[in-house]
């Protein structure tokens, strides 16, 4: 039984938006916002990896601000309304850690349509209400996809070590994460 069927079994109404692309675009987010509003939804569940979670974070920030364009929230803590709808993030891959982060990455296709650019928004209001990371959900992933996610983990794990904004605890955690990833990625 899939997650949607389980929700329906327990009496929850479910509306699905399944058009999120890798490296989610602003129009993915705004389409999700339109669906959310037209169906009178009251919460979000994102299922997947970083792209699904990031798009959902952007959508919930936009919904909390009466559907303002997600690109208006690029930068640090640009949202003014902390009363976002609840967001449950269910991970089916392990790569970005988006399900537990205050950051989300969106591709802006509207500011300069000839040169879309990715940006990061950091917002306390983007932190998910609940993150579900059940390794059982990863078992059905193809080996090649799991390896790609592992390299994504490795890239994200090394970022705090090489960042100019690092500090000793972040460097230690980064090194530990790199070692763990290297050890387990071989398996």
Give the residues covered by each predicted segment.
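Short, small-residue-biased leader/transition segments that mark boundaries at the very start
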Residues: 1-3
């Amino acid at each position: 039984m899939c997650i949607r069927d389980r929700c329906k079994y327990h009496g929850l109404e479910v509306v699905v938006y399944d058009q999120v692309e890798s490296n989610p675009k602003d129009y993915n987010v705004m389409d999700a916002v339109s669906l959310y509003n037209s169906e009178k939804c009251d919460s979000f569940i994102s299922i997947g990896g970083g792209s699904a979670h990031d798009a959902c974070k952007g959508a919930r920030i936009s919904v909390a601000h009466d559907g303002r364009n997600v690109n208006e929230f690029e930068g640090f803590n640009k949202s003014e309304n902390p009363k976002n709808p609840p967001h449950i993030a269910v991970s089916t891959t392990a790569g970005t850690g988006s399900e537990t982060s205050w950051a989300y990455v969106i591709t802006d296709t509207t500011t300069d349509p000839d040169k879309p650019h990715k940006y990061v928004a950091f917002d306390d209001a983007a932190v998910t209400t609940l993150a579900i990371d059940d390794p059982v959900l990863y078992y059905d992933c193809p080996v090649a996809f799991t390896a790609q996610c592992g390299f994504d983990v490795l890239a994200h794990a090394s970022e705090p070590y090489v960042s100019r904004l690092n500090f000793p605890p972040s460097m230690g955690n980064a090194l530990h994460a790199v070692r763990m990833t290297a050890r387990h990625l071989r398996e």
